Amino acid sequence: MLFFIVRLILCVCFFSFLMPLQSARAQQEIAMADQADIIETPEVVVSATKTPIPVARVTSAVEVITAEDMKRQNLRSVIDALRLAQGVAAFSSGGPGTDVSVRIRGGSSAQTLVLIDGAIVNSATLGQYNFANLTTDNIERIEILRGAQSMLYGSDAMGGVINITTKKGQGPPTVGAFLEYGSFATVREGGTVSGKQGIVDYSLALSRWDTSSFSAVNYRRGATERDSYRNWTGSARVGVDLPKDGRLDFNFRWTNSDVALDNVSATSPSDVFGSKNRSQEYVFSGSYQQPLTEWWSQKLTLSRAQEASLFLPGTLQRNLVTGAFSTPFGTPNETRVLSNRIEWQHDFRVTEMLLLSGGYQFREQQGENDSGLTNRILSSNAGFAQAQVNLWDRLFGTAGVRYDSYNVFGNATTYRLTGGYYSKETDTKLRTSYSTGFRAPTMNQLYFPNFGNPNLGPEKSQSMDVGVDQFFLSKSLKLSGGFFWNRYRNLIVTTFDPVFCAPFSTFQFCPQQLGDASTKGWEASLSYAYTSERQFLRGLTFQAQYTNTLTRDLDTAARLPRWPVDQWSMVIGYQPIEPMWITVTGRYVGSRFNTTGNNQSLRAFDVWSLAATYDVTKQVQVYLRAENLFNEKYEEVASAGVPIRSIFGGVRVAFSAKP
């Protein structure tokens, strides 16, 4: 903690040095006023109720990350943005391209639902989504919902939802490109085409990321081999405006990646030579929305997410504890997963005070691999209904219920209640929610050869939170705080039980529903963004978030693995002169246990980064990013590698046709 405070003071001193430059900006009032709107708190949130709703009436705990946020921080990966979000814990098992898990409010990564343009991308075999290969290219917005959201989204949303949206083309045709070079022989390059012609808008992007990277096992444990990474990503969104306010949207995202691997083990890590994982990911979605009357609208969404992942075990490995060489365990294995989804939603504006929504959802998951998991299908049909009430723009709330029917384990019913009060006089919002959730067992837990238990049912949860948002200075300053509580029942855990597991496994290990856990804690945040009317600290943005999370396995009284009690994040932005923007980010992660038995701890750490952009002309921008400024030595996962101090720089260009 002492080092954290010292580094924070250094960052404050850095910005204090820049403050005198502010006086030179007196002639830039108009330009700055135009940019003020860019960094204001987003006015509308969609994922909280599946309908556009003003932020002042949102009764869920939600955070929004915009494309502008990611651009100013020069972020390459979505996971780098999520690491700074409130109530979110992200853990990487090495460098770029290695497995990354994301958890919300103490839940597991399989209890966090991830959507890209309406398509569910959680793995059918593992349950979680691996963020390792998801870049920020062509992403417009990320909405993070904390707390159980199964009433709207079904299985996997027990902990929360991460909803990612692709950019929508607008304005005259624009062609852009970027080129970046930096530490670890990293090269990134890409191009974009976007715009709107008549009723058609489009946004296309293609990028390549190639790096020698660093060892997936931490170099402090003796690892010397670099584990390289390559990523090709393509993204497209095409929309058509239809008569009578109708709309067609088509979204596509493709990723081809190749990453070298090591044996990241808490007790016996190894450098592995020749081990790789190659994957191809496709995400497609299409939606059609059309108002039928002044009070009745509908939206139909079809989506498909597909992944093929090939694991190559390598030819030789060196144990970093004993120094012994051996042949890596395992054989080449390809896993193929597929997820299809249909959603048809109808919204009825009964009165100005009441909006009713109802919908049908169909979800199908398929999975197979070369290790004996034959093609299996999990499918579900679900219906949901929701009422949103708004009384005089002061009292508002939602109530909803959902029924899911699965082809494997039966049914699940969930519901959600929220309420809020907004005081216009003091610009204060009070909010609370209570919800239930569930998570269906994964294909591996049900059917993996010599392991799966086909008798498993769903995990279940209860979630509650209460919070307050206080605005000052015409909403340019916001203070928030709240408490949350989650209770998980029937958690699926892998156990050693020769008698129980005998029908399923000769290894005597199998999944059972024996787990119960709870998480609780409190959150606090502060954000400030300048407005065009005020001169004090003009050009400064500041965000700080703190989360305190107490987790407990109710069967063993142990803390849940890899969840810190305390974590902080901070983002400070400043524009000393009109063409320049500087951002400093820092995050602190408290000590935590690496395993369920709480017999191995990971120490606390804080990591700081610096990003700067400079507009050379209206068409050309240069940028710089420095990561791990203070060369912190830490591990997110026991023995996993992390980057040392590293620097990256690049140039962006964009040329638009005359309107």
Label for each model-derived stretch:
Residues 183-210, 221-259, 276-297, 349-356:
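Transmembrane beta-barrel wall of Gram-negative outer-membrane proteins
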Residues 119-146:
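Short acidic/polar hinge/loop motifs at secondary-structure boundaries
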Residues 268-291, 335-338, 427, 433-488, ...:
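Outer-membrane beta-barrel signature, preferentially recognizing the C-terminal barrel domain
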Residues 194-197, 239-243, 430-432, 528, ...:
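Conserved C-terminal beta-signal and adjacent last beta-strands/turns
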Residues 243, 253, 302, 351-357, ...:
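Structural signature of Gram-negative outer-membrane beta-barrels, strongest in the C-terminal barrel
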